[in-house]
């Protein structure tokens, strides 16, 4: 039975998309990755990655979703033919595994929001806040508890639907998040010692700008924070009107993501420098870029300022809200694929959320596990981006640009030289980056770099996890082709 298709308003669509962009990918991930990769050098590389990777990819995804009116699996089937269906499954699977560990991050934020109210202390040292962080993350029961709460909240809102749940929530949450980030950034940069952080953040160091690692991390961050390659823009674009301006919407997403990321950097990095005992200690903390950077240093910052309890609650509460707005899109990617196969939407929401919670318990068990998942599926995002580019090449890059991206009503037109060049070189660029990154693991783990059964950031674990997803996609390809509903451009021969 055909199910009623909900629609976003233009403002609601942009708010929901920004909800994905301005989540923990900016507030939690950007500062630590930026700090670990040289600050200013990383910002330059990341800006270039946004232009040559994220914006063209977001535009392509939006065009595909608007045209096909199906999820990732159906869109790949209809745009590329039935031999491309497994690629659509890979994109959806990458998003699912990202969702599974992403909710663990949301649980971290919920924990600190609760702690800010229930057991807030003043004038803590870095050692004390580091001990609090370690005590929490070393307790799987606590982490899984907050992980469960996070999924329950996200499931409840997505269950309400597109306009009644996701759009309504994001239109309030995103402006509030921007407001608190601006206020915290102003405060952080006025702290004594914050100038070292500003210098670190905006100084371009030669050794970092020439490092391939900086560029690879920049491209991963561009994908991670904008949602390029996740498949969520393909999914959300099912719910926009025919006259939605693709280039303008994607430009707003990119600029909003950039602003959110820079504001987050201005909050976290100057605060670390201001709160560290010595400049050397600050530099060491920044260069490590560990998972707890925000939860150790920003929490300590709040314990030292007037009204810290309230501000801490607001910050971590809004960070949890940012995370949950990102979760909406990840859940919706899986839900749309399941709904396309004839399952009722509300049943699909519950099934996807429950499966995500179960899989996410692996990441909740230890920091080592979540680091492994961040490593594997961060690379998976680049592969997903390459698959979307390959799909565009198969369908016709120029055809997508003229008929779908620069369609009638578009206020901004993406130039042929820019869009076509970026999309055509993207698969090669991804192969080079991922290949280099995987070969680097031979130096990091010379004895175990190909061992898939060790939880570390090595090549073996990537090949195993990618391999399982690809094999499942190939084996179930015919099932997906037959079971997935027909869209607006479906050809009968692709459904068998």
Q: Where are the regions that the model predicts?
A:
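Membrane-embedded translocation segments of transport machinery
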Residues: 2-7, 11, 167, 171-328, ...
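Membrane-water interface regions at transmembrane-helix termini and the short interhelical loops
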Residues: 33-37, 63, 79, 83-99, ...
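Hydrophobic alpha-helical segments and their helix-loop junctions in multi-pass secondary transporters
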Residues: 57, 102-124, 178-204, 273-274, ...
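C-terminal membrane-solvent junction of multi-pass transporters and transport-like membrane proteins
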Residues: 335, 342-353, 376-462, 491-496
């Amino acid at each position: 039975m055909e199910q009623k298709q909900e629609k976003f308003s233009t403002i609601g669509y942009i708010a929901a998309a920004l909800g994905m962009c301005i989540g923990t990918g900016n507030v939690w991930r950007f500062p630590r990755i930026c700090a670990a990769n040289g600050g200013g050098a990383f910002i330059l590389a990341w800006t270039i990655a946004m232009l040559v990777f994220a914006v063209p990819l977001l535009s392509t995804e939006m065009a595909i979703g608007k045209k096909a009116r199906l999820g990732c699996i159906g869109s790949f089937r209809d745009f590329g033919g039935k031999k491309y269906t497994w690629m659509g499954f890979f994109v959806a699977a990458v998003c699912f595994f990202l969702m599974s560990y992403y909710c663990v991050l949301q649980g971290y934020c919920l924990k600190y929001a609760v702690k800010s109210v229930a057991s807030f202390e003043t004038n803590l040292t870095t050692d004390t806040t580091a001990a609090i962080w370690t005590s929490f993350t070393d307790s799987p029961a606590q982490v899984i508890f907050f992980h469960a709460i996070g999924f329950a909240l996200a499931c409840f809102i997505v269950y309400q639907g597109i306009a009644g749940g996701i759009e309504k929530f994001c239109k309030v949450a995103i402006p509030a998040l921007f407001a608190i980030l601006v206020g915290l950034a102003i405060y952080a940069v006025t702290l004594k010692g914050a100038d070292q952080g500003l210098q670190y953040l905006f100084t371009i160091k030669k050794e970092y700008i020439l490092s391939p690692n900086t560029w690879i991390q920049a491209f991963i961050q561009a994908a991670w924070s904008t949602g390029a390659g996740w498949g969520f823009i393909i999914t959300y674009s099912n719910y926009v009107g025919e006259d939605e301006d693709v280039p303008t919407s994607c430009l707003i997403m990119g600029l909003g993501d950039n602003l959110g990321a820079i504001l987050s950097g201005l909050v976290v990095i100057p605060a670390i420098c201001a709160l560290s005992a010595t400049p050397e200690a600050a530099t060491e903390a920044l260069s490590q870029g560990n998972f707890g950077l925000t939860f150790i240093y920003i929490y300590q910052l709040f314990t030292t300022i007037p009204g810290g309890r309230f501000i801490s609650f607001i910050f971590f509460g809004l960070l949890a809200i940012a995370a949950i707005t990102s979760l909406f899109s990840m859940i919706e990617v899986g839900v749309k694929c399941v709904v396309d196969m004839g399952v009722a939407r509300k049943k699909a929401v519950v099934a996807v959320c429950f499966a995500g919670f179960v899989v996410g318990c692996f990441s909740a068990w230890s920091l080592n596990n979540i680091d492994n998942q961040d490593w594997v599926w961060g690379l998976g995002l680049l592969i997903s981006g390459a698959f979307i580019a390959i799909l565009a090449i198969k369908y016709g890059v120029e055809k997508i640009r003229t008929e779908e991206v620069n369609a009638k009503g578009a206020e901004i037109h993406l130039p042929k030289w820019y869009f076509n060049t970026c999309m055509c070189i993207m698969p090669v660029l991804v192969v080079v980056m991922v290949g280099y990154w995987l070969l680097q693991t031979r130096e990091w783990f010379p004895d175990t770099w190909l061992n898939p059964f060790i939880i570390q950031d090595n090549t073996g674990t990537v090949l195993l996890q990618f391999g399982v997803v690809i094999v499942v996609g190939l084996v179930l390809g015919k099932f997906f082709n037959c079971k997935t509903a027909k869209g607006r451009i479906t050809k009968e021969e692709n459904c068998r």
